[in-house]
Design a protein with these regions (language model features):
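All-alpha prenyltransferase/terpene-synthase fold signal
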Residues: 1-324
């Protein structure tokens, strides 16, 4: 059994060794640039961890794990373009270094490369893996569209938001685990339990992100807090604040949502103060714990020893208590 840290080192080394020797360089240089940015690599690590529950040698799953990471970075590349984001992981985004058209085309190439890497799995698993991967990719598009639609709405409900983050974030974590389990020879029941584990962990993970954007320590978080507040992003925090606010609090919240000329620090302080008075931090923590517990319940019934599941149990605890 490998630790999550050991698996991270292995997949980082494998990705660093990738050579994109095809031309033109203008298409492939941005791909190499995006993959060189690093990141948590949580999705390929989860795939390797699920595989490692059943098999000791994880090298046979390096290509599919690379595929899931290339796919994830493709979505980030296009997200950055849609959001007009200037930075990603402390570096300039592809459309800033090159241009919009290059970002679109290199992103498209990454999607194709992701499918090529994913298809490098045993023939007996190929259809199941590719069917799940394709469904997941489509669901992520659905989640992204929901998120974009929410920008134009002021009546987003909790259940809609949770469904959006399930599609936009959770399904790829869940698929990473299920694909790893299938390739490792898990039973259909275990593969589905690990999928449920990833699904619930993903929702809890996103809720933690929502929380950290308001209450994170800037020095630890690595970026300024309050970004979601400044752009009126429909997070769990804002949705629950609007739901539980009294008349005066609702008026103040709506003022800060609609005002266009404001001091950023003042807006963050005012909205955070409203969140504190309304009590949304506790509401978010409770919902996060609910999904965390569901994830652990699914992991508990996976039919391998507790010792072999220890790293997954440790990982979800680290994600829930992280400060970044």
């Amino acid at each position: 059994m490998f630790t999550a840290s050991e698996l991270l080192d292995k997949i980082n080394s494998h990705i660093a060794d990738l050579q994109f020797e095809r031309t033109p360089k203008g298409l492939y240089d941005p791909v190499a640039y995006v993959l060189s940015m690093g990141g948590k690599r949580i999705r390929p690590v989860l795939m390797l961890m699920a595989y490692n529950l059943y098999k000791e040698d994880v090298r046979p799953v390096f290509s599919p794990a690379t595929g899931i990471e290339v796919y994830h970075n493709y979505t980030l590349l296009h997200d950055d373009l849609m959001d007009r984001a200037d930075k990603r992981r402390g570096k300039e985004t592809v459309h800033k270094v090159w241009n919009d058209n290059t970002a679109i085309l290199s992103g498209d190439a990454m999607l194709v490369l992701a499918y090529q890497f994913m298809a490098e799995c045993p023939a007996e698993h190929l259809k199941a893996v590719m069917d799940l991967f394709s469904l997941t990719a489509l669901e992520i598009c659905e989640g992204q569209q929901m998120d974009m639609d929410f920008e134009q709405r002021s009546d987003v409900k909790e259940e809609e938001y949770l469904e959006m983050i399930r599609l936009k974030t959770s399904v790829l974590l869940a698929a990473s685990l299920k694909i790893g389990a299938l390739l490792g020879g898990a039973s259909a029941e275990d593969a589905e339990r690990l999928y449920d584990f990833g699904m619930n962990m993903g929702v809890a993970f996103q809720l933690k992100d929502d929380l950290l954007d308001v209450y994170g320590d800037t020095a630890v978080f690595g970026k300024n807090i309050g970004g979601d507040i400044l752009c009126n992003k429909k997070t769990y925090m804002l949705i629950k604040a609007l739901e539980h606010a009294d008349k005066e609090q609702a008026t103040q919240l709506k003022h800060w949502i609609t005002v266009t000329d404001f001091d950023p620090a003042e807006k963050i302080e005012a909205v955070t103060g409203l969140y504190n008075r309304i009590g949304v931090k506790l509401l978010c923590e409770n919902k996060m714990s609910e999904y965390n517990n569901k994830a652990l319940e699914s992991l508990a019934v996976v039919n391998v020893t507790a010792e072999r599941k220890r790293e997954l149990d440790k990982l979800i605890k680290e994600l829930m208590y992280r400060e970044v």
